[in-house]
Amino acid sequence: MFDPTLLILLALAALGFISHNTTVAISILVLIIVRVTPLNTFFPWIEKQGLTIGIIILTIGVMAPIASGTLPASTLLHSFVNWKSLIAIAVGVFVSWLGGRGVTLMSSQPSLVAGLLVGTVLGVALFRGVPVGPLIAAGLVSLFIGKS
């Protein structure tokens, strides 16, 4: 039986591997496994909670250097007096705000997710980009199309 969704997922996974975006490729392969096994009953839960769980894991990864002591408190405090660090803080606030808009947009208009994913994979493959941007990209899209 022909399954166009499975074909699209396989093509996106292949693009992920071709562009050395293993995070995207592995994620898609996991979803393919879920789709073709009895685990597919978990899709409603994955759709509802997946983004939240991903953000929690990402936040743990970002905060780990502070929690482990690799990033000393003195360095953290110094970031409030150095002008480059203040710019980094401002950009971090802006990007976090964009990411929040992106989550809202992706939740309200899931049809954009495929375009964001393809754009991210193409950016990695063609322009030596880094695959960090679907939420931020969605936030930028929300600015262009006027959605909050």
UniProtKB/Swiss-Prot annotation:
GO terms for cellular component: plasma membrane. HAMAP family: UPF0756. PANTHER family: UPF0756 MEMBRANE PROTEIN YEAL. Belongs to the UPF0756 family. The keyword Nucleotidyltransferase does not apply. It comes from the Bacteria. It is found in: Cell membrane. It is a multi-pass membrane protein. This is UPF0756 membrane protein Ent638_1667. It comes from Enterobacter sp. (strain 638).
